[in-house]
Amino acid sequence: LKLVEFEYKRNHEIINIMIIEEPEAHIHTHIQRALFDNLRVSLNYTQVLMTTHSTHLSEVADINKVNVISISSNSYISEVMKPTNQLDSFGKTKLELKDLKLSDCLKRYLDAKRSVLLFSKGVILVEGDGEEILIPAMVKKAFGISLDEIGIGLINIGSVSFEYIASIFSNERLHRYCSILTDLDSFVEGSTKCSEEAAKRGVTRKDKLDTLYGENSWVDSFYATYTLEVDFVNEIENRKYVENVVRNHYSRQTTIDKHIENINDSFVNRYDSVLTVAKDMGKGWYATVLSSMLDNDLVIPDYILKALVFASQKVLTEPVLRKIGIYVLDMYDEDETISELKKKFNIGDINETIKEFSDKLPDDLLTKFFKCRMELM
């Protein structure tokens, strides 16, 4: 009715602007969508502006008409970013899309889940269920924070190529750091589970991503040498978790013993065994069970740690860093060194405290995280 009233009262002699502020705060999701789909006033004389945080509205919105407003790092200036600015040109020249517009493809792809791309402060793109399930669990267990707490969106793109999604992050479009996580599937001589074709595809994928985004400061790619499952179990400290998954899944003791022996044997045997277990269980369920086995001895593989550092470099505030430091220190037996570090993480200069933590606990996973972070600064 308000739309009808607005149409009736409009003045043809002036510009008419209608502003709708955060409809999700007042109306149900389904009504939001209906409102948006049926929001039709004459384009000749009226402009409609809608502000929203709703992923449901971004799902039905034409991405060509979406702008993202963000407060810059100095907290005084807002910047407006258009996700599709020069996007079709990029698709045509860089991705060689002949008869397709990249913006149209993305419009069809962006559902309520993947619209997190537009609202997250940083993004990690992954290609499978295993990464989507295991990475958030590893971060929470290792550092005591969730990806949601720091505004990092982890998106499982499934069978969609990374380059189509990552293209919205650039100087011309969204100013968000985006980490691409993918497997190289490197060939393993003597393995019965390895494929030369998969290894070739891994090299081709790396070359393509490095070429496309090598000069894009907002996007970087991080590669598992083999696969998530293999790179995870290659860390000695992580093998006990995989052993527990084996004990949990299989009932025959001979099968359990064989897999556990292989996990701690040669690399080829470990490679074949862990991929067999993941296939038997299904990679998503394997990651789910594995997530429940994690404890404070966990080691996050380097490529995942670096991807987390890259995506979070704009959002790791001082309070978050202090929270992480205290969480990690709580895992240690209390002594004078640990007590002093806790005190400094509470009230000390954060940069000096990080340096002291790294000097006194050089083998801690958090020290490796801090070092990766320093390399980007």
Annotate the PLM regions:
Residues Q47, V60-V68:
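Conserved catalytic segment of ABC-fold P-loop ATPases
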Residues S72-M377:
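Acidic, divalent-metal-binding catalytic cores of TOPRIM
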Residues T51-S54:
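H-loop (His-switch) motif in ABC-type P-loop NTPases
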Residues A34-L35:
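Conserved hydrophobic alpha-helix in the ABC-type ATPase nucleotide-binding domain
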Residues I14-I17, N44-L49:
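Loop/turn-to-beta-strand initiation segments
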Residues L1-M18:
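GG-anchored amphipathic helix commonly corresponding to the ABC/SMC/Rad50 NBD signature/C-loop
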